[in-house]
């Protein structure tokens, strides 16, 4: 009774702008529609029921909007946190989301279950009941206050609003998370990094004129494909520490690129071998949407015409950019890259099967496919291309895959073919299998790492020639040039010694093929143990029984009368281990031969990752590189400086055995020695060795007598006896000083003491080479640089040797990068669309927006009003429109804007093109693009009872904002 009097006395006017008055009439309208809907039988009049349901949801949304404004005015500092809303997909972030949540809460509270979300529905039902009760309480309290004082909010209202706001925020997160995937805070942050990468990519593309600002402002459709492609290149090469940093853990990567992690590693390694010109060519190609426009003209490989001097200049440029990293980490990471997934696929052996797969590879070259069959092929592209591409980027495996086992071929010898042919560029290819060259990729299983390949001799190595110091040194270090001697690529290489006193024992190893004695196979670790447990400066492991060991040879100074022989496996392995200069206490390792008279002589250097450690006194490193071939991207390799063709002997050697001294001091012997230790160099003089004319050195005699005419076998046996005595000495010796033993080996003898950086023999005043710790650190740093550069050269040459030319490499990169980028359009369309939308907002030309830039605090009725919208200017209520529809009083539909009068979308201003077509809204008659008019709803005021196309604005504010035949409740 009191409420009736209060309503009669204090009922607010409909025109009152105060929020409590607006809420009163909005709540009244909602109750009227709810009452009519309850009394209606939906089976008898389904169309009427549909209209009432849509009107009911519209009224709910109106009530919630007003409550939201009341909370902003009543409890502005006590609102619930809604930062999680930024993680919601763009499709559901609109002003009428609150009404949908209310409708969902009522359905759940009444016992309904969300389709395919039974568990989530059961979990949310208690929260939904609490929310509906709280909302009813807020409505009753606010309605009662509207009949009292419109300018005052009681404490009871504030408390009810706080409780409702917290429950509503909790239900919003739970309900939306159950319906659509919602990112975690970490995933959202990673996506923000991807957006930054895309923006940086576009900014760089604008500077390099790959793109134009007009294309950004006009929302060019081709940019949806171009920008992700360029972003992959920039993320792997330019901004390598960003979200595409492949050194991160997989869970730290964006979910967009995580499935392509292995393939991205391969792409990154290929991109790092490109020159600046090749990279620009690739990026320009990625900006072309039609594959037919890809440049197919074969260009000469820039590396083919790049001389040692220009390579040195390029290296100096790279030094200014790249940090010198720890060599152990570098090699470990390089090896780990090649081990991941190469066992997953093996190409068929028969050429007919390979030829059948060629059309598939040809189809992969297309970056955009629209019919169903090609889309299916595109979905398979990432895995297929990734597997096939592994061979291009990976070193050969320890066990050859069936596709690359040696095949019989007639009349084709390696020596008879061109030294620069593509089949010789990679010794892994069988000379008769030329059809492999036409394939997109080859496949090798990556069972083992690069060190195992060195053991088996299956890794091609670069031709290194040492030249005279004049005009060929770089900061005192010799450079590497490609040997012009084509015979270095042959199967047979010679190993000879220049010792005159033991000429009868000289041996020549022809391709290592004659070494079949199992006992002659010696690893570096075994030799280290036999020589007293010393840490060798160069760890090289050879397997003389490898069938392809002809590609791995050590060329030493050769005497004219060196006879050939089939023995000496242990000798060869030991010679390789001793083939380094260890004259400096700080660890100066020279991985080159110093007495190579022919300029075309090559030297093979290798490393084993398990033995590769870097300390202040020990560096066990060597170089693995690819054989020169067509398409190689040669990088300069700097080796420790040499005095050219050194012929200096070591006069100041203190020995305990005269026979050993006679052998070690002959004029014809050339000791591996670096520039820092050779006579006449200031650095050697500053070491305070106490001797002039050359470095001090000491031969540690162990009681093993060596005869001048002893055979190699006898020397090996003597060498084995010596190791026992050495081991006894090691156990009792002191290791207080990291003094180095100078190598004094005869080139043909293995019984002499090996060179070492961390010898455990007792220090001798005569053999000590003292130096400061600073000098040692400097030398270590230089050696790390040398080994790092050598390893990079090896990896780059290995990769480039598998391609015919530069254009071939660029085209295959184009295929792979386009495949990954275009796959994002299918697998992650929503995320990519959100990223590109933010990108266009940031990179588009800024215009003066005035008051439109003011952020909205929340859903607001005023924000829905458009000045040029006739429907927004109407004052008629939705209930009046419903009454007219019931009476059959239909209005005339609005006039359509002529097609020629509009060239861009009314909403997003995107220009219309052949792809972006014009669409009229049936509610307002204006022209929109397909994205801005993607909704359908009935228009009862115009007599349209079936859903028709309407724009987003009309759908949200003027017709049936919640109509959808895809409702999940």
From Swiss-Prot:
PROSITE patterns: ZF_FYVE. CDD domains: FYVE_LST2 (cd15731). It comes from the Eukaryota. One of its GO terms (cellular component) is early endosome membrane. Pfam families: FYVE (PF01363). Zn(2+) 2 binds at residues 921, 924, 951, 954. A zinc finger (FYVE-type) spans 899-959. One of its GO terms (molecular function) is phosphatidylinositol-3-phosphate binding. Negative regulator of epidermal growth factor receptor (EGFR) signaling. Acts by promoting EGFR degradation in endosomes when not monoubiquitinated. The FYVE-type zinc finger mediates the interaction with phosphatidylinositol 3-phosphate (PI3P) and localization to early endosome membranes when not monoubiquitinated at Lys-87. Belongs to the lst-2 family. This is Lateral signaling target protein 2 homolog. It comes from Danio rerio (Zebrafish).
């Amino acid at each position: 009774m009191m409420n009736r009097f209060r309503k009669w006395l204090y009922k607010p006017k409909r025109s009152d702008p105060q929020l409590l008055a607006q809420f009163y009439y909005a709540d009244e309208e909602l109750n009227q529609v709810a009452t009519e809907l309850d009394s209606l039988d939906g089976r008898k009049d389904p169309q009427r029921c549909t209209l009432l349901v849509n009107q009911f949801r519209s009224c709910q949304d109106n009530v919630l909007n007003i409550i939201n404004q009341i909370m902003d005015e009543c409890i502005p500092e006590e609102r619930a946190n809604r930062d999680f809303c930024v993680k919601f997909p763009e499709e559901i972030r609109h002003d009428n989301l609150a009404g949908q949540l209310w409708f969902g809460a009522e359905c759940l509270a009444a016992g309904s279950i969300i389709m395919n979300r039974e568990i989530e529905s059961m979990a949310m039902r208690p929260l939904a009941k609490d929310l509906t009760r709280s909302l009813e309480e807020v409505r009753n309290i606010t309605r009662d206050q509207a009949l009292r004082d419109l300018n005052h909010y009681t404490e009871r209202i504030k408390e009810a609003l706080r409780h409702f706001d917290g429950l509503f925020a909790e239900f919003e997160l739970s309900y939306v998370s159950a319906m659509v995937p919602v990112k975690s805070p970490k995933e959202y942050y990673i996506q923000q990094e991807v957006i930054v990468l895309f923006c940086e990519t576009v900014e760089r593309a604008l500077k390099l004129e790959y793109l134009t600002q007009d294309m950004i402002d006009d929302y060019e459709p081709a940019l949806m494909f171009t920008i992700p492609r360029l972003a992959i290149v920039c993320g792997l090469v330019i901004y390598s520490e960003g979200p595409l940093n492949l050194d991160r853990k997989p869970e730290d990567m964006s979910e967009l690129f995580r499935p392509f992690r292995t393939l991205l590693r391969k792409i990154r390694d290929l991109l790092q071998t490109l020159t600046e010109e090749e990279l620009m060519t690739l990026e320009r190609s990625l900006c072309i949407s039609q594959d037919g426009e890809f440049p197919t003209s074969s260009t000469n490989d820039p590396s083919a015409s790049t001389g040692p001097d220009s390579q040195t200049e390029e290296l100096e440029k790279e030094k200014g950019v790249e940090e010198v990293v720890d060599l152990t980490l570098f090699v470990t990471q390089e090896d780990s890259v090649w081990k991941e997934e190469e066992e997953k696929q093996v190409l068929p052996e028969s050429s007919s099967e390979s030829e059948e797969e060629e059309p598939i590879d040809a189809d992969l070259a297309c970056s955009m496919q629209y019919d169903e069959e090609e889309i299916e092929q595109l979905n398979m592209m990432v895995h297929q291309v990734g597997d096939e591409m592994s061979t291009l980027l990976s070193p050969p495996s320890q066990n050859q895959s069936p596709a690359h086992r040696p095949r019989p071929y007639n009349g084709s010898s390696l020596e008879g073919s061109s030294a620069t042919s593509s089949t010789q560029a990679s010794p892994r290819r069988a000379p008769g299998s030329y059809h492999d060259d036409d394939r997109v990729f080859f496949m090798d299983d990556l069972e083992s790492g690069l060190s195992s390949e060195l053991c088996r001799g299956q890794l091609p190595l670069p031709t290194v020639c040492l030249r005279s110091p004049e005009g060929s040194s770089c900061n005192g270090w010799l450079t590497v040039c490609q040997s012009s001697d084509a015979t270095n690529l042959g199967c047979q290489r010679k190993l000879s010694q220049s010792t005159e006193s033991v000429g009868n024992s000289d041996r020549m190893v022809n391709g290592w093929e004659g070494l079949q004695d199992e006992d002659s196979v010696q690893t570096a670790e075994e030799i280290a143990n036999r020589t007293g447990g010393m840490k060798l400066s160069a760890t090289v492991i050879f397997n003389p029984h490898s069938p392809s060991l002809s590609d791995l040879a050590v060329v030493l100074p050769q005497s004219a009368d060196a006879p050939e022989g089939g023995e000496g496996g242990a000798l060869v392995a030991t010679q390789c281990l001793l083939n380094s200069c260890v004259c400096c206490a700080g660890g100066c390792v020279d991985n080159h031969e110093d007495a190579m008279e022919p300029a075309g002589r090559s030297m093979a250097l290798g490393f084993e990752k398990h033995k590769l450690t870097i300390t202040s006194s020990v560096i066990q490193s060597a170089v693995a590189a690819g054989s020169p071939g067509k398409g190689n991207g040669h990088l300069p390799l700097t080796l420790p400086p040499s005095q050219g063709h050194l012929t200096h002997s070591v006069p100041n050697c203190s020995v305990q055995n005269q026979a050993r001294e006679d052998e070690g001091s002959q004029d014809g012997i050339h000791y591996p020695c670096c520039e820092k230790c050779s006579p006449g160099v200031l650095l050697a003089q500053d070491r305070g060795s106490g001797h002039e004319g050359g470095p001090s050195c000491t031969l540690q005699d162990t009681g093993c007598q060596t005869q001048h005419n002893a055979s190699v076998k006898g020397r090996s046996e003597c060498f084995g006896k010596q190791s026992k005595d050495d081991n006894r000495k090691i156990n009792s010796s002191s290791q207080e000083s990291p003094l180095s033993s100078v190598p004094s080996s005869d080139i043909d003898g293995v019984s002499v003491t090996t060179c070492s950086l961390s010898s455990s023999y007792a220090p001798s005043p005569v053999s000590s080479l003292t130096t400061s710790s600073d000098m040692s650190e400097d030398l270590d740093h230089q050696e790390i640089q040398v080994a790092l550069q050598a390893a990079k050269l090896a990896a780059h040459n290995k990769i480039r040797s598998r391609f015919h030319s530069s254009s071939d490499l660029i085209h295959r990169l184009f295929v792979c990068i386009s495949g990954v980028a275009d796959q994002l359009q299918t697998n992650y369309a929503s995320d990519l669309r959100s990223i590109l939308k933010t990108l266009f907002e940031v990179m588009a030309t800024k215009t003066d927006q005035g008051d439109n830039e003011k952020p909205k605090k929340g859903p607001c009725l005023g924000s829905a009003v458009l000045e040029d919208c006739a429907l927004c200017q109407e004052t008629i209520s939705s209930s009046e429109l419903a009454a007219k529809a019931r009476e059959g009083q239909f209005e005339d539909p609005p006039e359509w804007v002529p097609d020629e009068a509009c060239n861009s979308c009314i909403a997003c201003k995107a220009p219309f093109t052949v792809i972006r077509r014009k669409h009229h809204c049936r509610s307002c008659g204006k022209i929109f693009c397909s994205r801005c008019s993607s909704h359908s709803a009935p228009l009862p005021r115009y007599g349209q009872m079936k859903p028709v196309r309407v724009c987003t604005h009309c759908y949200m504010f003027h017709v049936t904002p919640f109509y959808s035949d895809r409702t999940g409740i």
